[in-house]
Design a protein with these regions (language model features):
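Transmembrane alpha-helices and adjacent helix-loop boundaries
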Residues: 1-217
Length: 217
């Protein structure tokens, strides 16, 4: 039976925002922790650490996020470990985010002027101390804007979780469209919600880039 697209249907989609936000936050925090490790490994003195981190980045940047979602969700099932769509989506997005954030932050670390590295070395600092007290604090300022910009992409990427059955905004829209057959109204609302989530972040990223876009020499 075909239903009308009314307030109740719109509310169902709007309520799914909490799951999109939850998934985005979990993936961003987890990806941030992993990304920091990847960035530090990419700039480590050890060649084998750099190679492992580079391989990780190439693996996740070189394959579609959709395939990564499939592999985590169905791979766990094949291995006999049942996993719900939220957990599968969180794992896949976290691993993906770690690769992208790691590369973003690697660029920020290497953007710190050579003079800062040389000054820290001249003071007798070891690599970890040099990174902790001199390099990372400066790289962090440069990295704020692109990190917020990546968060915008991450929020939009959560829509792919609908393919494994996780009911976020896009999946909620699909469910309502299947019973109302009003795709323009349904997905128009979905698009508006994504815009309302992402536009403030995009605006914030631009402001932060203007403020912290350079490293002092």
């Amino acid at each position: 039976m075909i239903r009308q697209f009314g307030p109740a249907e719109a509310l169902f989609i709007i309520e799914a925002v909490r799951w999109t936000v939850l998934l985005s936050v979990v993936a961003f925090i987890g990806g941030g922790i992993g990304g920091l490790g990847v960035a530090l490994a990419r700039t480590a003195p050890s060649a084998w650490l750099r190679d492992i981190a580079a391989g990780y980045i190439q693996l996740f940047q070189g394959t579609p996020l959709l395939m990564q979602l499939f592999l985590v969700f169905f791979g766990c099932t094949v291995l006999g470990a049942g996993i719900d769509p939220l957990a599968a989506a969180a794992i896949a997005l976290t691993l993906n985010a770690a690769a992208f954030l790691g590369e973003i932050w690697r660029g920020c670390i290497q953007a710190v002027p050579v003079g800062q590295w040389e000054a820290a070395t001249a003071l007798g600092m070891r690599h970890l101390s040099r990174m902790r007290y001199v390099i990372v604090p400066q790289a962090g300022k440069v990295g704020i804007a692109p990190t917020v910009g990546f968060l915008v992409q991450l929020v939009k990427s959560t829509s792919l979780a609908s393919i494994i059955g996780f009911v976020e905004i896009t999946r909620a829209g699909q469910i309502i469209n299947n019973v109302t057959f009003r795709p323009f109204e349904v997905f128009g609302l979905v698009a508006v919600i994504y815009f309302m989530l992402c536009w403030p972040l995009s605006h914030l990223s631009q402001r932060l880039e203007r403020r912290y876009g350079t490293v002092s020499r």
